[in-house]
């Protein structure tokens, strides 16, 4: 067992996982959180070390995720399943913050898209997600990144970046 595995195994074992942890390895190409694939003798999980510089209010972040996933689940929509810690919390808070989800089999994450069909399908999936949330009470959510969903500001920032990109 590598030092990487030993360090993260102790973290993973703080969660209510099914089975004994048999392997932990880096997973994906994320740019914000450190993501690991945790394998037990019964199933697989995704464990993330949450970037608290990006998400300093981890309580709000996880509360938001739980509100949205619970709302979707009540509608019969397949969604993320947050795995609680052994003491019933939705994430582990210590020197670092960690969360665990069930691993969703047969899924793909793209860092870049060159295929028009994949791009089209991602737009459709996002539209379906928005549609599922149409009746969700957004006032329950806490802003975790200031003005992140401020489309006019984001578009103005985008245009300014384009204008500044002189070749």
Describe the function of each predicted region.
Residues 1-25:
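Juxta-kinase regulatory segment immediately upstream of eukaryotic protein kinase catalytic domains
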Residues 24-46, 50-160:
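Conserved ATP-binding subdomain of kinase catalytic cores across diverse folds
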Residues 163-167:
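Loop-centered beta-sheet repeat module
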């Amino acid at each position: 067992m590598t030092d990487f595995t030993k360090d993260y195994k102790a973290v993973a074992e703080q969660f209510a996982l099914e089975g004994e942890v048999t392997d932990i390895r880096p997973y994906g190409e994320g740019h914000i959180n450190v993501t690991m694939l945790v394998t037990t003798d019964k199933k697989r999980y995704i464990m993330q070390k949450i970037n608290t510089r990006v998400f300093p209010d981890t309580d709000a972040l996880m509360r938001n995720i739980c509100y949205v996933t619970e709302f979707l689940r009540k509608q019969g929509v397949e969604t993320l399943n947050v795995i609680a810690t052994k003491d019933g919390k939705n994430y582990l808070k210590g020197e670092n913050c960690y969360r665990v989800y069930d691993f969703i089999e047969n899924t793909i994450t793209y860092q870049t898209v060159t295929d028009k069909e994949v791009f089209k399908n991602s737009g459709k999936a996002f539209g379906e997600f928005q549609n599922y949330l149409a009746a969700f009470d957004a006032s329950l959510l806490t802003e975790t990144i200031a003005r992140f969903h401020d489309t006019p500001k984001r578009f103005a920032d985008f245009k300014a970046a384009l204008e500044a990109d002189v070749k």
